[in-house]
Amino acid sequence: MARRLWILSLLAVTLTVALAAPSQKSKRSVTVEQPSTSTNSDGNTTPSKNVTLSQGGSTTDGDEDYSGGDYDVLITDTDGGNHQQPQEKTDEHKGEHTKENEKTQ
């Protein structure tokens, strides 16, 4: 009887530890290096920024975890500040693509 109690308590401790451990997700990211300046259609020259695309994964710095199929864009300024901008399609953006697709058909 004591042996069964010992085995059950060992099993309970093992399950508790296994469930309490944080799950590890893989994090994928790609950094896109861009030229130092870019010129738009008006001829204006603007400094470019490095863009990092990342998907899923857990973070160790306390930032939110944007898991899922959409990519997040991390823009690194020249001053070293990071600004995370989730990519979201607006209704207006979707409407433009629908109109373009109708024109091509």
Swiss-Prot record:
Superkingdom of origin: Viruses
The keyword Phosphoprotein appears for this protein: no
TM region(s), chain numbering: none
Location within or outside the cell: Virion
Keywords associated with the record: Glycoprotein, Signal, Virion
Family, per entry: Belongs to the HHV-5 UL22A protein family.
Ranges of Basic and acidic residues composition bias in the record: 86-105
Annotated Polar residues bias: 29-55
One term under GO cellular component: virion component
Protein name, entry field: Glycoprotein UL22A
Species name: Human cytomegalovirus (strain Merlin) (HHV-5)
